[in-house]
């Protein structure tokens, strides 16, 4: 905590010094018509130490089936993305190691289960990149294609997205329980249409309030579907009344928020470099609270500390209820609810681990930034990742 405070104070003083220097230099040049001042120092901010915040969560390392499942999933994904993605974009996908996130977040599943999670994540990331380049109207069309493919066995519009999703449904989805399958499809419907809403907001240049953003982001993250996958792979078919239990939902929402808040912190530089930073919690916090970038990052870090406490308290409450429960059916439901929360905890921690292994957020400096937590901003609108590049 002391080191974090010292680092934060140092960067605040540095920013103030840069501002004063810029003003003094500008006044001198205006009066004396001398050579222009040198370029300003790059803007930096310090990431919250989420690894420390999440150190109470389970850490089972990397799934031992990673290499085999990854090779299979990449070969499967390549069959569909080559028609849509150019050579540079295909290489970008490879360097992002999207399959690796599932090996950190589902360390307990067998090879077939891991392969299912990898295929699903390749679909999610593919949809995310495609809709990042689309208008709100086109993004809604992509959402409809995805949902119809998941729900309608005979639907096929010939697109790569449709055929990829159809293949996933036939290969994996049929093995999940009825309650889990129903929730998965409902969550997919909401998530993909929420992604289209995000595209509409980007078109209009609209930044939501903190409350409005958190509500939308819970859906655009797609994390609900990943939680459904966790239940399915642990052979859990949670009854709806247990799923709706207020205590369980407190733990569920806390885990959900922790995943996308970490993602927003780590992806901020990449998104602002593309000009897409309107859909990021740091932008939202800065706009509503008038905080600077560093203070906004600190604000989110404190929020994560509150949420991890909420998550742990919910889990403990359910464990106490289980210890007193005499009804076998209710006890079984409570046991599955607790197991589900443990699975979500793997997701929260594994997401952070993966974020510093992939080059998606920090490029070749990922290991350096993991150690220092100092992010240097890339110039805004300097990155253009075209799908066909």
UniProtKB/Swiss-Prot annotation:
A Gene Ontology molecular function term of the record: terpene synthase activity
Residues that hold (2E,6E)-farnesyl diphosphate according to the record: 360-361
Residues annotated for Mg(2+) 2 binding in this entry: 128
Cofactor field: Mg(2+)
Residues that hold Mg(2+) 1 according to the record: 128
Primary enzyme class: lyase
Binding, Mg(2+) 3: 263, 267, 271
Catalytic activity: (2E,6E)-farnesyl diphosphate = viridiflorene + diphosphate
GO-annotated biological processes: isoprenoid biosynthetic process
Motif (DDXXD motif): 128-132
Stretch forming the signal peptide: 1-15
EC number: 4.2.3.88
Keywords (A to Z) from UniProt: Lyase, Magnesium, Metal-binding, Signal
Top-rank taxon: Eukaryota
Pfam family, one: Terpene_syn_C_2
Domain notes: The DDXXD motif is important for the catalytic activity, presumably through binding to Mg(2+).
Homology family: Belongs to the terpene synthase family.
Role played: Terpene cyclase that catalyzes the cyclization of farnesyl diphosphate (FPP) to viridiflorene.
Protein name (Swiss-Prot/TrEMBL): viridiflorene synthase Agr2
């Amino acid at each position: 905590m002391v080191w974090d405070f010292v680092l934060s104070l140092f960067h605040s003083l540095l920013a103030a010094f840069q501002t004063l220097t810029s003003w003094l230099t500008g006044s001198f040049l205006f009066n004396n018509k001398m050579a222009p001042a040198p370029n300003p120092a790059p803007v930096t901010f310090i990431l919250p130490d989420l690894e420390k915040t999440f150190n109470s969560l389970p850490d089972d390392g990397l799934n031992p089936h990673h290499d085999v499942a990854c090779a299979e999933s990449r070969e499967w994904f390549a069959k569909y993305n080559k028609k849509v993605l150019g050579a540079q974009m295909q290489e970008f996908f490879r360097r992002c190691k999207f399959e690796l996130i599932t090996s950190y977040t589902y360390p307990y599943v067998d090879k077939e289960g891991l392969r299912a999670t990898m295929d699903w994540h390749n679909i999610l990331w593919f949809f995310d990149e495609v809709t990042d380049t689309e208008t709100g109207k086109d993004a809604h069309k992509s959402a409809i294609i995805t949902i119809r493919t998941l729900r309608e066995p005979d639907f096929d519009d010939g697109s790569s997205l449709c055929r990829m999703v159809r293949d996933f449904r036939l290969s994996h989805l049929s093995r999940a329980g009825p309650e889990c399958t129903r929730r998965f499809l409902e969550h997919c419907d909401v998530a993909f249409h929420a992604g289209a809403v995000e595209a509409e907001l980007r078109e209009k240049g609209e930044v939501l309030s903190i409350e409005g953003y958190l509500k939308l982001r819970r859906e655009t993250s797609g994390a609900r579907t990943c939680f459904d996958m966790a239940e399915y792979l642990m052979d859990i078919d949670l009854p709806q009344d247990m799923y709706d239990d207020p205590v369980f939902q407190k733990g569920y929402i806390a885990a959900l928020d922790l995943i996308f808040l970490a993602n927003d912190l780590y992806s901020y530089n990449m998104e602002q470099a593309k000009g897409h930073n309107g859909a990021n919690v740091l932008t939202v916090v800065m706009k509503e609270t008038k905080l600077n970038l560093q203070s906004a990052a600190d604000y989110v870090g404190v929020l994560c500390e509150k949420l991890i406490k909420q998550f742990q308290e919910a889990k403990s409450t359910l464990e106490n209820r289980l210890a007193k429960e005499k009804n076998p059916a209710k006890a079984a439901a409570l046991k599955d609810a607790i197991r589900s929360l443990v699975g979500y905890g793997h997701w929260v921690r594994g997401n952070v681990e993966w974020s510093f292994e992939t080059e998606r957020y920090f490029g070749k400096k990922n290991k350096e930034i993991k150690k220092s937590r100092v992010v240097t901003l890339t110039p805004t609108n300097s990155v253009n990742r075209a799908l066909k590049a």
